[in-house]
Amino acid sequence: MDEQELDTRELDEAQRQEKLQALDAKLAQIQELLQRMENLAQLASRPECTPPRRARLQGEFHRLKGEIDQVADSLWML
């Protein structure tokens, strides 16, 4: 294997590592959003949660779902 092939392999490995780090960051972002969604669902399920508050929580839940969709769509661009 010559020096140019070694340089190319090292570059390829560095690019793979960068991509894995970017994917890891995106997955961590999705995990945070899912945790918030779980918290919203728990709040909405409480008996003392009023219908207007439940509607606000549901609105935030759907907004977070949209954010997850955006993050998931961005994974294809990596």
Q: At which residue positions do the language-model features occur?
A:
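Amphipathic alpha-helical polymerization modules
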Residues: 1-78
